[in-house]
Amino acid sequence: MPRKGPAPKRPLVVDPVYGSPVVTQLINKVLQDGKKSTAERIVYGALEGVRNKTNSDPVATLKKALENVKPALEVRSRRVGGATYQVPVEVKAGRAQALSLRWLVGYSKARRENTMTERLQNEILDASNGLGAAVKRREDTHKMAESNKAFAHYRW
């Protein structure tokens, strides 16, 4: 085991178009097979579509969508004796951000629109309005934590 503690977080390069680290994180989540320019084209196209549909700042809309998708609680498996319990725990800020981006991109891929740009754009718009599959995933996660509240004393 390392003795120096966890590795330091690398600084995130802000994207050149919007100057926002959140957009950079979204690009990195969309990224597949190292094709960064394709991922950038998808994300920038989706954000441009958000701007056209809402006539407002697309980064603000994205941040609102992420806030609506971020989970506050989740369940983690904990083995006690012979039984495995689903223990509700609070989600740290960094993990909440990562989960919200992962869910947003994942449920964008599952949508029925033609291009990934359209899918991502519509999922961002739905999430910013409190709708969509990513928001439902957050609600399901919270519901699971609520129903397992009895095991909260096993928290670590």
From Swiss-Prot:
Keywords: Ribonucleoprotein, Ribosomal protein, RNA-binding, rRNA-binding, tRNA-binding. Coiled coil: none annotated. PROSITE patterns: RIBOSOMAL_S7. GO terms for molecular function: rRNA binding; structural constituent of ribosome; tRNA binding. It comes from the Bacteria. One of its GO terms (biological process) is translation. GO terms for cellular component: small ribosomal subunit. Pfam families: Ribosomal_S7. Belongs to the universal ribosomal protein uS7 family. Part of the 30S ribosomal subunit. Contacts proteins S9 and S11. This is Small ribosomal subunit protein uS7.
